[in-house]
Amino acid sequence: RVLLAPLVAALLFQPRASARLVAGVVYLVAAVSDLIDCEIARRRGEITNFVKLVDPIADKLLLAATLIPFWIVTESDPQLGGLPIFGGIPLWTLLVFFGREILVTVLRTRAARSGTVVPAMPIGKYKAAAQSVFSGSMIAWLALRTAAAEKDWSGGTYQAWESFHGWFTTITLILALILTV
């Protein structure tokens, strides 16, 4: 995931729908590989203190690789945002997400220095899952909006899908924010 995060970010900065669609596929591979890695490690009893410390950092890098480019791209072209309620991603949501992640990372690092490993709590895992679903949905949203602009989509089917997907993405953002605080 650490290696895939910069690729996701670079692809999201590309102005073509195809690049943003590939970003979504790469993101999906990274997210699914995280689930598979964790499950395999759990089954084999190979969850080390190092993994407990590094895994959340990889999650944060992947989150940053999606949220920051999405915010920058939609700020530079507001038509690509268009989420219900929010438009794009408000800057304050990034501050909430990253503020919490920085605080938790600092606290975990301090605990690790004193020999204590603080594993993720169940609520933290739900938060990470909500953020992951939101990030994936947001990448798909950006690819969809970019494709619509490139291909001049405007029909009823597109509008229905855009409305559904926009609300789904907005609801997952709200859920991720609630679980973050």
Locate predicted features.
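A feature for the membrane-embedded catalytic helix bundles of lipid/isoprenoid biosynthetic enzymes
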Residues: V2-A5, A9, A17, V22-L28, ...
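Cytosolic, membrane-interface loops and tails of multi-pass inner-membrane proteins
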Residues: I36-K52, R110-A120
